[in-house]
Amino acid sequence: MRVFAVFLAACLMAGCASKPDYYISPAPVTIPKTATYWLDTFDVEVVGKNERFLPDDKVRQQLGVDLVDRLLKAKRYAASKDKADYLLDVNVIYTRRIQDTQGGFMTAIVDDKTILASVDFNYQVKVKKAGAEVLHFSQARQGLMPGGYKGDWQNMKTMAGVLTNSGNSSVETFYTGLLSRFIVDDLRDIPSR
């Protein structure tokens, strides 16, 4: 019975520590850790529209600029499409979770639809070479909220927005300036054989 319990515990720990799934083509794939990428297509769908927050085009632009900037800083972005080792097709669904008490008790404190409570950041990345897909991966990151010392500052601004009933529309630039790091981290974690 103890052996079974240890085996079960090991299986649970292995599942919790797993990385994203990488779907690789039938032919063996080798992607060096120094490979460079070029952003071929970048599509963003924004869910949860609200005039208080950034327009869809601005969200799309900020996420794309942040992704390219992070790849440049990691020395993984090519100088041109022709010089890139791999091309990337990125599809993003950016979902705002906007507070709505539907006339509940909180409405007496802060107006509905003025507080961005969290965001969902879901994405699929296809890595291509010579026009053919080499691999793809996807992630669904739900309920993301500001964290760390910069996030604590954003949370304080949100609390001030609640107390003054002015909302927290400024927190969205915090999200759009950080979320692309998840994609870059996943690209960095692609196994090289």
Regions found by a protein language model. Give the residues of each.
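C-terminal/domain-edge helix-coil "capping" segments
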Residues: 17-29, 126-193
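A structural "domain/chain start" motif
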Residues: 15-69, 74, 163, 180-193
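Surface-exposed short loop/turn segments
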Residues: 82-150
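Solvent-exposed, acidic/flexible segments
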Residues: 56-64, 114-118, 164, 168-172, ...
